């Protein structure tokens, strides 16, 4: 019998500084990250949550699929956009976070 671990919550796209004036998009959100971690450990995981029906939402869906996470209950919301977080780094390596408002 195969046990599936269901991860419920947010999936966000983190925007990290790659070089001056350029941000790199990375998958984020603790529940989505946990689902990926379980799958990488050969576990059977699934993600339940909502993203926007937009390019960031499609990026999150494709990333989870590529990581072998079941996304059948991941909803693409046409009324709200995918959550995004801009991550900043100060001179000491401390992170700051700017969360976009009204996400999915």
Predicted regions and their residues:
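Residue-level recognition of conserved structural "scaffold" positions that shape functional pockets
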Residues: 16, 35-36, 59, 100
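Short glycine-enriched, charge-decorated loop/helix-capping segments at active-site entrances
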Residues: 20-26, 102
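Conserved N-terminal subdomain of the carbohydrate kinase-like
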Residues: 44-104
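Alpha-helix C-terminal capping segments
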Residues: 33-44, 89
């Amino acid at each position: 019998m195969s046990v599936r671990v269901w991860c419920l919550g947010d999936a966000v796209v983190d925007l990290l500084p790659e070089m001056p004036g350029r941000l790199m998009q990375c998958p984020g959100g603790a529940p989505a990250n946990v689902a990926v971690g379980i799958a990488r450990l050969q576990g059977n995981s699934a993600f339940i949550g909502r993203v926007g029906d937009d390019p960031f939402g499609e990026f999150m869906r494709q990333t989870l699929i590529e990581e072998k996470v079941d996304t059948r209950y991941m909803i693409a919301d046409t009324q709200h956009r995918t959550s995004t977080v801009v991550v900043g780094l100060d001179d000491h390596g401390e992170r700051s976070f700017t969360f976009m408002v009204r996400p999915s």
